[in-house]
Amino acid sequence: MSVVVKICGLSTCDTLEAAVAAGADMVGFVFFPASPRHVGLDVARELSDQVGSRAAKVALTVDASDALIRDIVEILKPDLLQLHGSESPERVRALKQAFGLPVMKAIAVATAADLAMLPAYAETADRILFDARPPKDATRPGGLGMTFDWELLRDLDLSLPFMVSGGVNPGNVAAALRVTGAGGVDVSSGVERAPGAKDPELIRSFIRAARASEELMT
């Protein structure tokens, strides 16, 4: 089984190069000022040029306006839109139609009740990302290093490809994939030495661990 590996929250040329050179399938860029991983449009343009076609580019937004997404699409030229806020299934459909791009919708998970909206999102999104539900007082919806109970996803009956995130790191990524049966994994804080500061060696270690898990899942 081939695992899709996404390194999210990249903001510098050297860490982006580390991710691409190590074989990341997707590289994510955060457009959300409250995040320490936020990048402006000028930086996004530079990073987009650096990636070229070597990896799929993912634009992460949180309840963003059409105008902002339009600017991001024009400059980053993403392959995938990642909606990490409270966007409804109808909003997912509208953005797909407006920009002609596939959408990955993030679902915040703490209990089984959080999966209730899956059928509705499965009708509109192209991919689902399961992330840990943040505390009520959190200022951002992800990248907090929190995990959730992966057993909630075991034997999940979902017609869409899905990825798992939330507190994954080089030491636990194999377990996350094994328990959830996810076809992909998304990491941000798990490859950082400080919030927003990606570590090239941790990036390489994470990708090696994810690739090693493929052999165990075949």
UniProtKB/Swiss-Prot annotation:
Family matches, as Pfam families: PRAI (PF00697)
- Top-tier EC class: isomerase
MF terms (GO), sorted A to Z: phosphoribosylanthranilate isomerase activity
**One GO BP annotation of this record:** L-tryptophan biosynthetic process
In terms of InterPro entries, this protein maps to:
Aldolase_TIM (IPR013785), PRAI_dom (IPR001240), RibuloseP-bd_barrel (IPR011060), TrpF_fam (IPR044643)
Q: Which UniProt keywords apply?
A: Amino-acid biosynthesis, Aromatic amino acid biosynthesis, Isomerase, Tryptophan biosynthesis
Catalytic activity, EC:
5.3.1.24
Q: In which pathway does it act?
A: Amino-acid biosynthesis; L-tryptophan biosynthesis; L-tryptophan from chorismate: step 3/5
Q: Does the keyword Isomerase apply?
A: yes
Q: Per its UniProt record, what SUPFAM superfamilies does this chain match?
A: Ribulose-phoshate binding barrel
Catalytic activity, reaction form: N-(5-phospho-beta-D-ribosyl)anthranilate = 1-(2-carboxyphenylamino)-1-deoxy-D-ribulose 5-phosphate
Task: Give yes or no: UniProt keyword Amino-acid biosynthesis.
Answer: yes
Family membership, please give it: Belongs to the TrpF family.
Q: Please identify the protein, giving its name as recorded.
A: N-(5'-phosphoribosyl)anthranilate isomerase
- The organism is Rhodopseudomonas palustris (strain BisB5)
